[in-house]
Amino acid sequence: QERASVIYQHVCALHDFYGEALGVRFARKHIAWYGEHLDNSKAFVQQFHRLTTPLEQRAAVKAFFAM
């Protein structure tokens, strides 16, 4: 799915560019925006906001989109 790939790559780019601490925070903001445009994403967005590492966030995106 192209949308899933774009979102995953965007999250990875945020982590790579901003580093772990800021990258995780910025990824939360962007996932919240993406969530407004995805079906059945409320629980995913809520869970994503509790994640504290890039690895957890990347795994969550993969799991949500079944990548």
What is each residue range found by the language model?
Residues Q1-M67:
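Alpha/beta catalytic cores of nucleotide-metabolism and tRNA/nucleoside-modifying enzymes
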